[in-house]
Swiss-Prot record:
Family: Belongs to the rotavirus VP6 family.
Subunit description: Homotrimer. Interacts with the inner capsid protein VP2. Interacts with the outer capsid glycoprotein VP7.
Keyword Transferase: no
Descriptive protein name: Intermediate capsid protein VP6
GO molecular function, one term: structural molecule activity
Organism encoding this protein: Rotavirus X (isolate RVX/Human/Bangladesh/NADRV-B219/2002/GXP[X]) (RV ADRV-N)
Gene Ontology cellular-component terms listed: viral envelope; viral intermediate capsid
Annotated GO biological process: fusion of virus membrane with host plasma membrane
Compartment(s) of residence: Virion
Keywords on record: Capsid protein, Intermediate capsid protein, Virion
Length: 396
């Protein structure tokens, strides 16, 4: 979109100006920066644009960008004048975002529709397709002008309940005879308690929101003494089983767990121990775990008598903590990353919802909701707003 590309270019120029140091010799790069600044100043200085202010009223925004004399040494006054001039330009661009963002669109747009915004874009006259915030580049991705960017993400795991109740043979009211799972996963963390009331391994999956790779750690937490099991396929009015558990993590050994990393249903890597692992590109982590077995049962406490028959008084249990330390994936509208925070902050200050004369209904005013949480009829509108704010958030 032309307004986003203009913001990108002004942000890049601001960074170049800030990299200059006053009262020092100016070399070729510095001279080029001053020339680029002066080119915009000569076109925009004194221009007035009627755009939306922070209370959504049409107000005159005047650009104050005096031309800077070219010399071998940049004075402090000239450096401050350049910095203030670019801030004046950002005031106009912020107002342009509020003005253009108030206009609904039903498809991906590449050109500003508001006449005053288009006038400002043409007067500034510089553009750049690339922003340091990958969410600002998503409209370029949608129009096939750019590929998705590979970036660290904050929420590789899909939000899911990990509940299972599988009876086998005889059962009792303390969890005997059941294989059971009770757990949750979201963001970068999954915690699952495995109750093994009879022989056999238990398998469960942690699904990824998007295919990603990175580093994860697996460790055991202290297991609860009593835990209410899910009903599984039983009628909802059944009385749930309260399993009486014994934490057997002290005898948990290498080989009692198998981790398989899967991509599109195909195993692309595996491990058989706890600890920190570098995992390959995958969209699912499948974990098979067996806290207790026949060998361990040979020297078992009396609480585990008749465990092979499924009628033990207490059940072997472990709690597994899965933590994805870091993960990288192609940025998409539904992925969360560090780039959301700064833009969302601006949505509470410079770009509050009240500063838009019209805003998408039934949408929480955050970057995540604008990018992926809007109703279908408003999604292109909300994404336009989000991408413009994301581009603006890169300014110093």
């Amino acid at each position: 979109m032309d307004l986003i590309e203009t913001i990108n270019a002004v942000v890049e120029l601001q960074h170049r100006v800030r990299n200059l140091s006053p009262n020092t010799n100016i070399y070729q790069d510095g001279q080029t920066t001053i020339n680029d600044y002066n080119a915009i100043a000569s076109r925009c200085n004194g221009k007035v644009y009627n755009l939306r202010d922070q209370i959504a009223q049409l107000s005159p925004f005047q650009v104050h960008m005096p031309v800077i004399p070219i010399s071998t040494i940049l004075s402090t006054d000239d450096h401050e004048t350049m910095s203030a001039g670019i801030e004046s330009l950002f005031d106009v661009l912020a107002a342009a975002i509020r003005t253009e963002g108030s206009r609904q669109n039903r498809a991906v747009v590449t050109k500003s529709i508001e006449p005053e915004v288009l006038k400002a874009v043409l007067d500034i006259g510089i553009r750049s397709q690339f922003s340091e915030n990958p969410y600002a580049n998503m409209l370029q991705v949608d129009t096939a002008k750019m590929e998705q960017q590979l970036e660290p993400i904050d929420d590789p795991l899909a939000s899911q309940k990990i509940n299972m109740l599988a009876a086998g043979g005889a059962t009792n009211n303390t969890g005997g005879g059941y294989h059971a799972l009770v757990g949750r996963a979201t963001g970068k963390t999954g915690v699952v308690t495995i109750i093994q009331g009879r022989p056999g391994a238990v398998t469960f999956n942690l699904n990824m929101k998007v295919p990603c790779s990175g580093v994860l750690s697996l460790t055991l937490l202290p297991a609860p003494g009593v835990i209410q099991l899910s009903l599984g396929n039983q009628p909802p009015n059944n009385i749930p089983v309260h399993a009486e558990c014994v934490d057997v993590s002290t005898v948990f050994a290498e080989g009692d767990i198998v981790i398989r990393f899967e991509l599109a249903g195909r195993v692309v890597g595996n491990a058989n121990k706890l600890g920190t692992l570098n995992f390959p590109l995958c969209d699912r982590i499948s974990i098979t775990i067996e806290p207790w077995n026949a060998n361990k049962q040979n020297n078992a406490n009396a609480n585990f008598n008749n465990w092979p028959a499924g009628t033990a008084q207490r059940q072997p249990t472990v709690s597994l903590f899965v933590n994805i330390i870091n993960a990288s994936s192609l940025i998409d509208y539904e992925t969360h990353s560090k780039y959301l925070a700064g833009a969302t902050y601006l949505m509470g200050t410079t770009f509050s919802e009240d500063s838009f004369i019209a805003s998408p209904p039934n949408v929480v005013w955050t970057m995540s909701s604008l990018l992926s949480g809007a109703p279908p009829q408003y999604i292109h509108w909300t994404r336009k707003i989000a991408c413009m704010i994301a581009a603006f958030s890169c300014k110093i």
